[in-house]
C-alpha cells in the first residue's frame, strides 16, 4: 500500500518573498536553457486558455495567510503574455488578495508593445533580454528578432528591470550591454548565472559591491543598479503555482519537494502495480 508523502512544514508569515503563478504551453521563443524543460512533463500542462488557472484558490488563500506582497506572472516553458486572460486574472487577484501586493510580469518582451495596455496594468516588469546583437540573441533565445527594448522602456508607465542570462555566448558583450541599457533608460538590471553553472565569468570585477540582496552582490554601474544573481547561492524564497495545479514551496523550481514527492509516488506505483 502506498504511503502519502510526508507533508512539508507549513510556511509562516514573513518567510516568503513572493508568489509565482506559472504558465505553460507553446512559446514564442525557444531558449535552449529553459529551466522549465527540466520539470516533469506532467507539470507543464498547457494552461494558456484556462481561467482560472488550476488550484488558484489555494494560491490566493496562502498569499493572504502568509501576507505575501509580491505576485509574479511568469512561465515554466512559455511566456506569461501569451496567457489569454492576462488582464482578467490581474483583476481577480486585485479583488481577492487582501495584502497591498504588487504585481509584476517576467516576460521575454516579445508581446510587450502589442499588449502595452495590459503590460502597463502591472506595477512593474522584468524582461529577459540577453543581448542587443541578433546573432547572440538567437543563440540564447532561439529566434533572431530582438524585441525593441528601448521602445518598451520609453512607452511603459511602470518600472522595467532587465534580466540577462550570462554564458559563453554573451559574456564578452556585457560591459557594452550594460552601457546600452543605461543609455536607453534602464535603471535596474540583473545578470544571472545558469542554475548549476560553476564557471566564474570575468564581469564587474572593477566595480565595487555596494550591497547584497539575498546573498547576491549588488553593484552601481555608472548609476545602473546591477545585481549578479547566483541561483545556487541565493536565499530567496517563493510560493509557486505550477501549471498542473501543484503548489510548490521551493524558490528553485527543479528542487520543489512537492514535485519530488509526487515523482517518488509515481515511481513506486509503477514498480508495484496493484
Where are these regions (language model features)?
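Radical SAM enzyme [4Fe-4S]-AdoMet core and its adjacent flexible, acidic
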Residues: 46, 135-150, 154-244, 248, ...
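Aromatic/hydrophobic pocket-lining residues that form the small-molecule binding cavity
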Residues: 52, 56, 86-89, 145-149, ...
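Short acidic active-site motifs
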Residues: 55-59, 112-115, 173, 189
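Short, well-ordered alpha-helix to beta-strand connector turns
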Residues: 16, 31, 122-123, 186, ...
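Distinct, well-ordered alpha-helical segments
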Residues: 84-91, 112-120, 172-180
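Core AdoMet radical
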Residues: 18, 38-53, 66-83, 94-112, ...
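Acidic (Asp/Glu)-rich catalytic clusters
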Residues: 62-65, 116-122, 150-156
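Canonical Radical SAM [4Fe-4S] cluster-binding loop centered on the CxxxCxxC motif
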Residues: 1-54
Amino acid at each position: 500500500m502506498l504511503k502519502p508523502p510526508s507533508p512539508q512544514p507549513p510556511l509562516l508569515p514573513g518567510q516568503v518573498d513572493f508568489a509565482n503563478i506559472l504558465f505553460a504551453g507553446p512559446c514564442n521563443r525557444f531558449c535552449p536553457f529553459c529551466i522549465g524543460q527540466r520539470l516533469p512533463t506532467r507539470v507543464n500542462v498547457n494552461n494558456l486558455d484556462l481561467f482560472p488557472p488550476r488550484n488558484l484558490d489555494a494560491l490566493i488563500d496562502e498569499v493572504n495567510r502568509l501576507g505575501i506582497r509580491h505576485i509574479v506572472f511568469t512561465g515554466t516553458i512559455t511566456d506569461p503574455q501569451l496567457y489569454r486572460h492576462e488582464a482578467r486574472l490581474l483583476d481577480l487577484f486585485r479583488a481577492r488578495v487582501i495584502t497591498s501586493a504588487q504585481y509584476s510580469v517576467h516576460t521575454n518582451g516579445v508581446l510587450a508593445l502589442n499588449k502595452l495596455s495590459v503590460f502597463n496594468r502591472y506595477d512593474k516588469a522584468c524582461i529577459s533580454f540577453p543581448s542587443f546583437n541578433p546573432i547572440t540573441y538567437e543563440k540564447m533565445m532561439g529566434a533572431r528578432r530582438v524585441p525593441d527594448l528601448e521602445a518598451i522602456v520609453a512607452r511603459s508607465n511602470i518600472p522595467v528591470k532587465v534580466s540577462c542570462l550570462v554564458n559563453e555566448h554573451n559574456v564578452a558583450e556585457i560591459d557594452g550591454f550594460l552601457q546600452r541599457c543605461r543609455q536607453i533608460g534602464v535603471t535596474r538590471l540583473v545578470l544571472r548565472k545558469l542554475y548549476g553553472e560553476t564557471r566564474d565569468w570575468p564581469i564587474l570585477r572593477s566595480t565595487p559591491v555596494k550591497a547584497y540582496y539575498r546573498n547576491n552582490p549588488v553593484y552601481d554601474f555608472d548609476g545602473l543598479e546591477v545585481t549578479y544573481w547566483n541561483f545556487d547561492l541565493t536565499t530567496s524564497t517563493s510560493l509557486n503555482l505550477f501549471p498542473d495545479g501543484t503548489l510548490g514551496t521551493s524558490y528553485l523550481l527543479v528542487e520543489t519537494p512537492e514535485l519530488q514527492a509526487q515523482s517518488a509516488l509515481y515511481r513506486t506505483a509503477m514498480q508495484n502495480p496493484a
